[in-house]
Each structure stands twice: as C-alpha cells, then as structure tokens.
Amino acid sequence: MRAPVSFDPFRRYWRIYGGWKALLTSPYFHLAVILTAVCYPLWSKAGTESADLAISVIPSVMAFSLGGMAIVLAFSGGRFLTVIRQGGDDASLFMTVIANFFHFLVIQTLALISALVALSFPKLLVPSGVAFFFLAYSVTAAIASAASLFNVSRIYNVVGDDENQS
C-alpha cells in the first residue's frame, strides 16, 4: 500500500537525505547526543528552563533555515542551475542541498513540538531531555546547513550565471 500523496515529499526528502544511515552516522547528530549528555544538569532540573530556551531559540533558527533555502532558490537560474541540477537527478547537488534544509526544518519543528510537550509536563525528565536533544541537534545542524550553503556558493563562484553576466 502506498503512502498518501501528502507524505510523498517526506518520503522523497528522507531518501535523498540518506535515511537512517545518514542520520545515525551524522557527526552533527553525534554532537547533539554529546551536548545533551554534557548539559544534563541544565535540562534535568524540574521546571521549564530548557523548554523555554528551545521556544526562544528555535524560531530564529527556523528563520535562518528558510532564509538559506530562499538564497539557494534565488540563485537557481541559468547555467548555475543547470550545473547543480545534474540532469534532474534526484540525488543532484540541488536536491541534496534542499533535502538538507528540509531536514534542518524537520529537526527544528520537532524541537519546538517537544519543547511544548516538555512545558506541559515540567516534572517529567524524558520530555525535557528529548526537547533538549532536538534543540542541540537544531543548533549543530545549523553548521551543516551553513556548510551546504558554502559549498553551493563555491560552485556559483566558479560557474557564475549567464543571466547575470553582460
């Protein structure tokens, strides 16, 4: 049985991103696990401090993500787009960068949702730990997204864009 059409973008993103293997071998994921363990004293206290932190930080990080995606899409024209589309392949650099930003937004959304759950249950340790992990993963994944933008900009620097050259 096939998943509903509304899940198709998620299926495609997950495949292009690399699935569970890419997630579980990601150094950014590992760093988030380490940060969550090291910061145990911060998120394990009864109360809502770590959830409040996530709710105050994540919207700004989401804006960075959407801005980064907008930059990639804005520069996606002419010769540059032809080069990074790699013949329309699903695994092209263009689709990989977009999938990375999509992943970044999924992580941030999970961070926000888990922070709201942690706020609802301030005396429970697990929701607070999960919320902190997704916050940490959002922050570490910001580095990965910035690296994707940097790589795309290096290609743009070499290839340029016929439409912008007179």
Task: Locate the predicted segments by residue.
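Alpha-helical transmembrane segments and their membrane-interface junctions
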Residues: 37-40, 105-128
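Alpha-helical transmembrane segments
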Residues: 50-66, 135
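Alpha-helical transmembrane segments and their immediate juxtamembrane interface regions
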Residues: 72, 130-163
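Short membrane-interface loop/juxtamembrane segments of multi-pass integral membrane proteins
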Residues: 81-100
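Alpha-helical transmembrane segments of integral membrane proteins
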Residues: 59, 98, 102, 127-141
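Select subsegments of transmembrane alpha-helices in polytopic membrane proteins
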Residues: 24-31, 96-108
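Membrane-water interface of transmembrane alpha-helices
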Residues: 68-82
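N-terminal juxtamembrane cytosolic/stromal segments of multi-pass membrane proteins
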Residues: 1-34
